[in-house]
Amino acid sequence: MTAKPTIAFSHLGCEKNRIDTEHMIGLLAEAGYGIDANEALADVVVVNTCSFIQAAREESVRTLVELAESGKKIVIAGCLAQHFQDQLLAELPEAIALVGTGDYHRIVDVLQRTESGERVNAISQEPSFIADENLPRYRTTTSAVAYLRVAEGCDYRCAFCIIPHLRGKRRSRSIESIVAEAKQLAAEGVQELVLISQITTNYGLDRYGKPMLAELLRQLGQVDVPWIRIHYAYPTGLTPEVIAAIRETHNVLPYLDLPLQHSHPEILKAMNRPWQGNVNDRIIEKLKEALPDAVLRTTFIAGFPGETEEHFRHLQQFIQRHEFDHVGVFAFSPEEGTAAIDLPNPVPDDVKEARRDALMATQQPIAERRNRAQIGRLVDVLIEQEHPSTGLKIGRSARFAPEVDGVVYVQGDAALGQLVTVRITDADIYDLHGEVASAADLFQVSRQPSLA
C-alpha cells in the first residue's frame, strides 16, 4: 500500500480563511495524512490564498511562485482559486489542484484524486457550503482563542467589495449548531470566542427571516466561555435588541468592530452604502450612551473614486470627533468585477497613500490617549505567549481583539491560556504594559462596593 503524502499548509488572508484551513487540516488528519508544519519537508503544500485586494493577491502569487520554484507540488485553495480558477492551472504546472471557498470540505477527495495523477479543479461556481460543528477542525490559533463562524457569504453589493463573488450568498448556521460548537470549544479550554461572518449583525436573516444576533448572544451567554467578542457589526444592524443583548449577557464583551468605511454621505452613496450616510453619528452616539464602556474599532477607505479634499476633511473630523479606540485605514484598491472600478474621478495613488497616512496620524494620539487612560486600572488579561528573550508574558485585555489590535506586556508569573488580573503601569499608541496584580490589589478590589 502506497504511503499517503505529507501535507503542509500556508495560510494567507483573514480569519474566515483560517477556519477553512483548520477544517482542511482536521479532515486530512482524520483521513490519515501526515501534517507537517515545515513546508520544506512536506510532499504537498496547500496554500489557502487571499484575493480581497491587489496587495493580498500579490502576496498569494509570491507565495505560490516561491513554492513552485522550489519544486513543490501545490494545492491552491481559497479566494485566489475561486477568483481565477483555470487560469492558475494553466500558468502553474506545479499546481496539482484548485479548491474553492465553498469546497474545502472536499480536500480529502481532492488529494486522493491527485495521487492517481489527476489535476483537479474542485471549485463550485456559486459557493454554498458552510461547515457545522460536526466537520473535523484542528485549531491553529493560540489554545485559549477560537474563531466561531456564524454565517458565510454576503448579499450586499458594496461598490468596492468582491467578497460576494468570492464567498457566495449569505448562509447562516442554526443557533443550535453554533451553540454546540461553542460548547465543544469551551470543553477544549477556550477562553475567548470571536464571532465572525461577513456581516455579523445580519446573522440569521436568510435562515429565520429576520436578524437573530440578539437571540444568538443570549444563547451563547449560557456557554462556559469568559469572553465572547463580535467582529464585523454592520452599523445599521445594531438594533436596540442587539445592544440590550450585549449589555445584559455577562460574557459578551462591549467591543464592537464597525466597518464604517467612510463618513461623508456622498462617498457612502458612491460606495453603495447610502442608508449609512445620515446615521453614522447617531449610531456612534447611541452606542456610547447605551454602552458607556464600549470599545469601538472601525476601518476606513482613503481615496475612494470621487473623494475630494472636502470629503477627506469630513472623514478626518469624524475620527477626531468620535475618538475610536482602534482604527484601520486602507488606501482604495480598484478591483475587477466591482462597480467602483468604473467610477469617474479616480484619486491618484500618491494622494490615496498620503490621505491614508494622514488619517492614521490623526488616530494615533487618540489611541494613545485612550490607552493611557488604562494606567492604574486592574484588568483581566488573557495570557497567550511568552516573549522568548525578555520572559515577559504577552496577552490581551478585553479592549484588544486578536491579531488586529494591540497587546499587553505583563511582568510576573502567569499561566499561558488563562485570564489573569493585571495592574496596568504604562501605555503607548498601540500596547499596554502591566504587572500581575498583587494580593493587596485584589483585596482592595474585593472591598469595593458593588456598582450594580
Swiss-Prot record:
Under InterPro entries, the record lists:
Elp3/MiaA/NifB-like_rSAM (IPR006638), Methylthiotransferase (IPR005839), Methylthiotransferase_CS (IPR020612), Methylthiotransferase_N (IPR013848), Methylthiotransferase_N_sf (IPR038135), NA-bd_OB-fold (IPR012340), Ribosomal_uS12_MeSTrfase_RimO (IPR005840), rSAM (IPR007197)
Q: Where does [4Fe-4S] cluster 2 bind?
A: 154, 158, 161
What positions does the domain Radical SAM core occupy? Answer: 140-369
Which EC class does it fall in? transferase
Q: Which domain of life is it from?
A: Bacteria
Q: What is its main location?
A: cytoplasm
Q: Which segments does the entry list as coiled coil?
A: none
What is the catalytic activity of this protein? Answer: L-aspartate(89)-[ribosomal protein uS12]-hydrogen + (sulfur carrier)-SH + AH2 + 2 S-adenosyl-L-methionine = 3-methylsulfanyl-L-aspartate(89)-[ribosomal protein uS12]-hydrogen + (sulfur carrier)-H + 5'-deoxyadenosine + L-methionine + A + S-adenosyl-L-homocysteine + 2 H(+)
Q: Name one Pfam family in it.
A: Radical_SAM
Where, subcellularly, is it found? Cytoplasm
UniProt-listed Gene3D superfamilies: Methylthiotransferase, N-terminal domain, Nucleic acid-binding proteins, tm_1862 like domain
Free-text comment on the cofactor: Binds 2 [4Fe-4S] clusters. One cluster is coordinated with 3 cysteines and an exchangeable S-adenosyl-L-methionine.
Instruction: Tell me its EC number(s), please.
Output: 2.8.4.4
Q: Which UniProt keywords apply?
A: 4Fe-4S, Cytoplasm, Iron, Iron-sulfur, Metal-binding, S-adenosyl-L-methionine, Transferase
**Which family does the record assign?**
Belongs to the methylthiotransferase family. RimO subfamily.
Question: What is the role of this chain?
Answer: Catalyzes the methylthiolation of an aspartic acid residue of ribosomal protein uS12.
Q: Which HAMAP family match?
A: MTTase_RimO (MF_01865)
**PANTHER family in the cross-refs:** RIBOSOMAL PROTEIN S12 METHYLTHIOTRANSFERASE RIMO, RIBOSOMAL PROTEIN US12 METHYLTHIOTRANSFERASE RIMO
Q: What is this protein called?
A: Ribosomal protein uS12 methylthiotransferase RimO
Source organism (scientific name): Synechococcus sp. (strain ATCC 27144 / PCC 6301 / SAUG 1402/1)
